[in-house]
């Protein structure tokens, strides 16, 4: 293993990278690793990044981890967030091959304007941890659920529609959709917009909740 990418918003500590902790515990000494902090999109960014390293011939094998301990940043007195999030982890191995399959394409979006709707107020360099921030519960997740719901339904469907259009695919060509497990309403609304049969849309949120960066690899 020459590369480990850990996708997480709940790292063990600010530094070193959790990927390096994983490498050490797995006895991997002759590679490199780094973390990607990109919220619910993190695993897709990590998968794409690792694939590019492999495709370029820079590494032969890479591991992408999605791991979260959302319970560490969830306020269990906040009914808007505490029923939603869960803890979990999963990993995938990518390696070079001559076989005619693999990652066909990717569509990635980010929109910094939405930061006000979903964030963690304190704990970073803008607002370091203090007695005041702890007392104000500013180290927990803050989410405006309705705003996030509207954006997620539109953008998840748009990204899927774009990648299908670019590759001349229809809903009949799709064996399974592995969506981020944000919540059941978002998943079902996205599947409906894409005109996919419900049995093609994989769901495990009822078991694990929203594990942020870990949802997609856990579905795999």
Over which residues does each language-model region extend?
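Conserved beta-strand elements of the Class I
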Residues: 2-5, 63, 175
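Acidic, glycine-rich active-site loops and adjacent beta-strand->loop/helix elements
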Residues: 7-13, 38-41, 66-71, 109-111, ...
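Claisen-condensing/thiolase-fold acyl-transfer catalytic domains that form or cleave C-C bonds
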Residues: 10-11, 24, 28-30, 38-58, ...
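Acidic-glycine-rich active-site phosphate/pyrophosphate-binding loop
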Residues: 13-27, 64-70, 125-133, 186-198
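Flexible, glycine-rich active-site loops centered on histidine and acidic residues
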Residues: 55-89
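Condensing-enzyme catalytic core mediating Claisen C-C bond formation in acyl metabolism
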Residues: 78-150, 154, 158
